[in-house]
Regions:
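Bacterial N-terminal signal peptides
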Residues: 9-21
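Extracytoplasmic loops and strand-loop junctions of Gram-negative outer membrane beta-barrel proteins
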Residues: 93-95, 132-143, 192-197, 234-236, ...
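Outer-membrane beta-barrel channel domains
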Residues: 41-43, 55, 60, 91, ...
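Predominantly the C-terminal beta-signal and adjacent terminal strand-loop region
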Residues: 431, 539-581
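N-terminal periplasmic/intermembrane-space "pro-region" immediately following the signal or transit peptide
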Residues: 23-168, 175, 400, 404, ...
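Signature for the C-terminal beta-barrel architecture of outer-membrane proteins
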Residues: 223-226, 234-422, 483-485, 492-493, ...
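Short loop/turn motifs that connect adjacent beta-strands in outer-membrane beta-barrel proteins
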Residues: 81-110, 121-125, 159-172, 217-227, ...
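C-terminal structural cap/anchor segments
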Residues: 411, 415-526
Length: 581
């Protein structure tokens, strides 16, 4: 009896072992998974299998769906998804580079834009002998002018690569611009030296502003560092704020980066095309006599502190002798002032600039020194050596939706225009975004110097360089120089509206050049106050529709009054609308 329970116990254990399922062994399990498990497992890509083991027929089940490429995966039919259209620039569009047109990595981006400017301005304007009105006894006449300028641009960009961070393998781009402009003034001999042309001018131009090919020579690291070359008509800016050379012109550029994009470099050469006088666009011919520009620069990110990018550069400009009238029949080269003869010049700029943040303070700085030689400066009446410099600094601080800022700009002036050294700073072809940029009265307008054929300051420049024209004239390093002190604030009023307010005080550095040209012994340094405001409006929070509104008032100082014999305030107001597809 005592052995019977023990026999029953061993019999129960034996039956349980025989009837139990096989033990689970985790990752060592070799049995095939059931249907539910198989659906949860990731599918191995077929291309990873050896050629001999590839199945002839693809599996026919719900887990395998062939796609042409990753760009054409059809999204679910949710209400948030918008069906694409070739006329819709906002959503996925094969014509906007969102989808490849060939294979998996060749894209085409077509764009079109209309840019319309309407500008009312007041500029000191001489009243000549053949006046437009009777009873114009005074030297200066009516200052009012109206400018309407319209550009229509068509662009095609074909490239191989990815649309994100990977550099292009190759690229072709072209941009064609058609221009129509209209100018109305109140005095004769402004639109043309022939007074019979009257006080209005309507003109047009067609230009190729971009036409280049780009090719990636080599990948320099697994982190998408690269070396590329670009040849043709191409845009280029030699520094952060456009102080020295900013243009879209004919050239060759070698560029790239290394150290995971912490270092970038450019080596560029330009043989500049002639510019159209009234539109500023490229003409279909090289500059008469020739002007070549060579630029080498190097950028370093997070140096010497995190958030700050520093740049060093060397830029060389060589101008040959030439004789050139602009489209309005005014003499552009050589500058029609002093002892003007055809002359050549060479200058080398050594620059150090920076842009970024130090802690929470935004910092922009620049310093340039230029040296060279001019074979016959018209103001000096002789050959001169060039020695001049420029400095700029902007500090700003972001606090919520406000950015208050303070800026200073300095360009050296020449205190002895008759000696053999030219000490007034001049650029190659500048377009500075500084101390108010295009909203500034001083930066936006060309102010003609009384009784000469040169401008005190040119449109799109801060420098009182006494050139006939920034686009078609020659650099002139005998000039008065300038101090500019700026106080401003940028206000993000709403996500679509930005307000920019600036107050600039301007003063000449040296007066001897102006006194020599104007035969005036008494000219004071104070140029005046430039008060300007601008609004940028983007109704859709993108760049497809952008409207700019600007207004500036110039309060003449004692020096400006000495030159132009008036202390009346001058005004400018403009609106600029850009529509882009």
């Amino acid at each position: 009896m005592r052995g019977r329970p023990l026999k029953f116990f061993f019999a129960f254990i034996l039956v349980a072992v025989v009837l139990s399922p096989p033990a689970q062994t985790g990752r060592a399990q070799t049995s095939e998974p059931d249907e539910d498990q198989r659906k949860r497992l990731p599918l191995r890509p077929l291309y990873s299998m050896p050629e001999a083991f590839r199945p002839e027929d693809k599996p026919e089940d719900a887990d395998f769906q062939p796609y042409t490429d990753r760009w054409r995966i059809t999204p679910p039919e949710y209400e948030v998804n918008v069906r694409s259209s070739r006329w819709d620039p906002y959503n996925q569009n094969i014509l906007k580079g969102d989808l490849p047109i060939l294979g998996n990595d060749i894209f085409l981006n077509l764009s079109a834009s209309i840019d319309t400017l309407v500008e009312f301005r007041q500029v000191p304007t001489p009243c000549g002998v053949s006046a437009a009105r009777p009873f114009c006894e005074e030297f200066f006449g009516k200052p009012e002018q109206l400018l309407v300028n319209n550009n229509v641009a068509l662009s095609a960009d074909l490239f191989k690569g990815l649309t994100a961070f990977k550099p292009f393998d190759w690229r072709f781009k072209t941009t064609f611009i058609g221009n129509v402009n209209y100018l109305r003034v109140r005095e004769n001999a402004i639109v043309n030296p022939d007074v019979r042309r009257g006080t209005t001018r309507t003109d047009g131009a067609a230009a190729v502003q971009e036409l280049f090919a780009e090719y990636k020579i080599a990948d320099l690291s697994p982190n998408f560092d690269f070396l590329s070359i670009r040849a043709g008509i191409q845009p280029f800016n030699s520094d952060f704020r456009g102080f020295i050379f900013t243009d879209s012109n004919l050239g060759v550029r070698l560029f790239g980066n290394f150290e995971s994009n912490r270092s970038q470099f450019n080596l560029a050469y330009f043989d500049r095309l002639e510019k159209d006088t009234n539109s500023g666009l490229n003409r279909f011919k090289t500059r008469a006599g020739g002007q070549s520009v060579l630029v080498a620069n190097y950028y370093r990110q997070d140096f010497p502190v995190l958030g700050l990018t520093e740049q060093v550069s060397v830029q060389r400009v060589a101008e040959s002798k030439s004789f050139h009238f602009d489209n309005n029949d005014f003499l552009a080269r050589p500058d029609p002032v002093g002892d003007f003869n055809r002359h050549s010049s060479k200058a080398i700029y050594f620059g150090w600039t920076g842009s970024g943040k130090i802690d929470r303070v935004n910092v922009e700085h620049a310093f340039y020194f230029v040296k060279g030689h001019d074979s016959h400066n018209p103001i000096a009446g002789r050959d001169v050596d060039i020695r001049a410099y420029m400095a700029a600094l902007e500090l700003s601080y972001d606090r919520d939706w406000l950015r208050p800022k303070v800026s200073y700009f300095f360009a050296s002036g020449d205190g002895n225009p008759r000696d053999r050294t030219a000490r007034g700073f001049d650029s190659i072809f500048d377009n500075p975004n500084f101390v108010g940029g295009g909203f500034s009265f001083w930066n936006r307008l060309a102010v003609k110097l009384t009784g000469t054929g040169v401008n005190l300051v040119n449109r799109g420049s801060l420098l009182p360089d006494l050139r006939s024209s920034k686009e078609e004239g020659q650099p002139n390093f005998i000039n008065p120089g300038i101090h500019i002190v700026n106080f401003g604030v940028d206000v993000e009023v709403t996500p679509t509206v930005k307000l920019l307010l600036n107050a600039n005080y301007l003063e000449f550095v040296k007066l001897e050049t102006l006194q020599l040209l104007l035969f005036q012994s008494k000219i004071r340094k104070q140029i005046g106050w430039d008060l300007n405001a601008g609004i940028r409006y983007r109704p859709f929070n993108n760049n497809n529709v952008i409207a700019f509104f600007g207004f500036a008032t110039f309060l003449p100082g004692k020096g400006f009054k000495d030159i132009f014999e008036s202390s009346k305030p001058l005004h400018i107001g403009f609106t600029n609308l850009t529509l882009t597809f």
